[in-house]
Swiss-Prot record:
<keyword id="KW-1133">Transmembrane helix</keyword>
<dbReference type="GO" id="GO:0004175">
    <property type="term" value="F:endopeptidase activity"/>
</dbReference>
<keyword id="KW-0812">Transmembrane</keyword>
<feature type="transmembrane region" description="Helical">
    <location>
        <begin position="161"/>
        <end position="181"/>
    </location>
</feature>
<feature type="transmembrane region" description="Helical">
    <location>
        <begin position="41"/>
        <end position="61"/>
    </location>
</feature>
<feature type="transmembrane region" description="Helical">
    <location>
        <begin position="114"/>
        <end position="134"/>
    </location>
</feature>
<feature type="transmembrane region" description="Helical">
    <location>
        <begin position="10"/>
        <end position="30"/>
    </location>
</feature>
<feature type="transmembrane region" description="Helical">
    <location>
        <begin position="81"/>
        <end position="101"/>
    </location>
</feature>
<dbReference type="GO" id="GO:0005886">
    <property type="term" value="C:plasma membrane"/>
</dbReference>
<keyword id="KW-1003">Cell membrane</keyword>
<protein>
    <recommendedName>
        <fullName>UPF0177 protein YbdI</fullName>
    </recommendedName>
</protein>
<dbReference type="GO" id="GO:0080120">
    <property type="term" value="P:CAAX-box protein maturation"/>
</dbReference>
<comment type="similarity">
    <text>Belongs to the UPF0177 family.</text>
</comment>
<dbReference type="InterPro" id="IPR052710">
    <property type="entry name" value="CAAX_protease"/>
</dbReference>
<dbReference type="Pfam" id="PF02517">
    <property type="entry name" value="Rce1-like"/>
</dbReference>
<dbReference type="InterPro" id="IPR003675">
    <property type="entry name" value="Rce1/LyrA-like_dom"/>
</dbReference>
<keyword id="KW-0472">Membrane</keyword>
Amino acid sequence: MEAVHDFYPILFLVILFIVLYIAIKTGVFAHFKETFRLQNLLWLLGFVIVGYILGNIAHYLYLRFVPALDTIVENEATNNFVDSFLPTWFVYILMVVIAPIYEELMFREYFYRFFSHKWLAYILSILLFTLIHTRLTWSFFEYLPMSVIVTSTFHRYKRVSDSIIVHGGYNLMVLIFHIII
């Protein structure tokens, strides 16, 4: 099991570097500097905070209305799957850095390039991102607000670096509060 435990982080990193290489070669990060202008960073921080608040409201409603047994089974299945083959330190890096980069490139940047109608890309991006994270369970409604926030962030200027920062910032807030509480 130890060999598998060490293999997955390497595999994830190789896939990430391939996706990043393609993104750089196709000019995805051409407007990267605009992301780090102070006014834009303040907007992104606002998106993270609003996303976190909406995510917590959705989480509360999810726990309030979905039967407790279903909630426990859904969360344990995901946690056990990830914990079974990844070291804890890598799960944190995966959550805050790797997943936001990979998912934003796939669900925002490439989705918008594939669909010529931007509102169709917007709706499908939200729905598929949420479905991938929830596997058609009631937790769909828990993930939906964050999916809307991150997709709206990208939709605003069509800059994937903006949505990567919001996605990573949101995941970082979730991680910090999960560790603290």
